[in-house]
Swiss-Prot record:
Name of the protein in its database record: Thymidine kinase
UniProt KW keywords: ATP-binding, Cytoplasm, DNA synthesis, Kinase, Metal-binding, Nucleotide-binding, Transferase, Zinc
Enzymatic reactions: thymidine + ATP = dTMP + ADP + H(+)
Residues that bind Zn(2+): 143, 146, 180, 183
Subunit (UniProt): Homotetramer.
Record's keyword annotation contains Phosphoprotein: no
Species per Swiss-Prot/TrEMBL record: Streptococcus thermophilus (strain CNRZ 1066)
């Protein structure tokens, strides 16, 4: 029986490499998968899933208007699994499509993404994945400033933390760092340096 999985983590927790590893494991057994990613993520190139260690794969870019259910339903032969990167950028309708893929097509769906934004609010896609997923798993990493588990993302501009602004501002380690709750509220000023 297929299930909807949401695997979330902060920036730099290894979500993209994990999705590429899952795809490899399926394909090594001769089981095709479908890779999807958000059209919004243009850090590397639209339509690619890229890890910080240099691995990358082509993926179908999805947007707010994409009917993911119809896209998957039209694929023949059916994939063994649907894998989605940057799932925080999904809409409510996109997530409902994922649930339909699981329930009506009996295809497992694994979505990977951030849970909360730099202001500590849930992304729309993450909110509905938390509500509808059968299994939810945290991908862990450590705080930039200490050894605690990182659970939040701190947006940086010119070495200073930023707590206001638009929710979606595409960027990598030069713009965001993963931190624990303590250091989200009180980042150590003497250790804040612009990331390269």
């Amino acid at each position: 029986m297929a299930q909807l999985y949401f695997r979330y983590g902060t920036m730099n927790s290894g979500k993209s490499i994990e999705i590429l590893k899952v795809a490899y494991n399926y394909e090594e057994q001769g089981k095709p998968v479908v890779l999807l990613t958000s059209r919004l993520d243009d850090r590397d190139e639209v339509g690619y899933i890229s890890s910080r260690i240099g691995m990358r794969r082509k993926a179908y870019p999805i947007g707010n208007d994409t009917d993911i259910f119809d896209y998957i339903d039209d694929i023949s032969p059916r994939p063994y699994c649907v894998l989605i990167d940057e799932a925080q950028f999904l809409t409510r309708a996109n997530v409902y499509d994922l649930a339909r893929i699981v329930d009506e097509l009996d295809i497992p769906v694994m979505a990977f993404g951030l849970k909360n934004d730099f202001q500590n609010n849930l992304f729309e896609g993450s909110k509905y994945l938390l509500l509808l997923s059968d299994k939810i798993e945290e991908i862990k990493t450590i705080c930039h400033y200490c050894s605690r588990k990182a659970t939040m993302v701190l947006r940086m501009e010119d070495g200073e933390p930023v707590y206001e602004g638009v929710q979606v501002q595409i960027g990598g380690h030069e713009s965001y760092i993963s931190v624990c709750r303590k250091h989200w509220f009180n980042p150590p000023r003497e250790r804040i340096v612009p990331l390269k």
